[in-house]
Amino acid sequence: MAFVALFGIGSTNFHATIGTPNGDFVSDVSSEPTQPHRLETQLLERLEEMQSLRSLDAVAISAPGLVDAEAGHIRKFDTPAGDLIEHIDLRTPIESRFDLPVYLENDCTASALGEWYFGRREDHDSLIHLTFGTGIGGGVVDRGHPLRGESAQAGEFGLLSVAPESELSSTGVTGAWEAFCSGRGIPEYVAHRLETDDEWSADESVFTRRVAEDAELSAPVVFEDAKSGDAFAQSCLAQISRYNAAGVGTLCNAFNPGLVTLGGGVALNNEEWLLEGLERHLEEFCFVDQPTLALSPLGENIGLYGALGTYRDRTGRQPGVEVPQSASSTTD
């Protein structure tokens, strides 16, 4: 039985554990703040601790940003503080110190692999995983094979334009999905609408008074006030639901998945709202057979399962599916 050191690295949190190819975690899951400016050192420190627990056979990492899986480094990492860190080499220091193979994957593609191997795929041949976090990202796995794209940048689903006439944008993309529906986008959209929608700008609701008093505006605040009956917050979330359906519908028409799983903080904390909105509006935007929609059963550990799915994918340990040479080769 192989023992794999697993790392689920996010922009904010850094999770680690030891797992086996069948999906079992054999050590406690540790969680700490991500230290992007010393990420290599942070990995090495945790690996030292893991080596004292088990004799490790490999290291698998799910990481955000622009990832070069073949070279084993992160090309670009955007920190929560807005810094851009370029070229974080993860493979070389690990191989040099521990002499272990290292398998690295972008967190969105890795999450889709985690769903394929360890989620609720059942008998579906094709799935999409969507993460609604600070932004929106995702991955596609079709018949066991992840879609990475020409330069391994596939999965930037949050940059699909769902409102091309809008003034809002993300990463320079006008009307980008995540500019409205992500953890960062929801409050930005609400603030923009409050400034530009004459119907609501003078409304004396709890929500608009909160904004007028310069109280904190965040996605949780929007959901909290909507649940309390605030008409403006409810109106905003109703429109956001349609934008979500437009994004998911576009993906369905492009990839025809049998299953779409949803994860990330916005989804995990607002499951009923997200699923109800998609079920209500998806037929407006989806021509192909509608997929099964479900919250990911992997929860907050999806990054770790994604790392383990990456290990399975790269080593060809995929039961019942023939793996082509390009997928079964290591990233050495």
Predicted feature residues:
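Short beta-strand segments
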Residues: 8, 60-64, 129-135
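Conserved A3 ("GATE") glycine/threonine-rich loop of ANL adenylate-forming enzymes
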Residues: 12-13, 108-110, 134-137
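A charged helix-plus-loop insertion that forms the helical arch/lid used to bind
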Residues: 73-84
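Glycine-rich phosphate-binding loop of actin/hexokinase-like ATP-binding domains
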Residues: 122-181
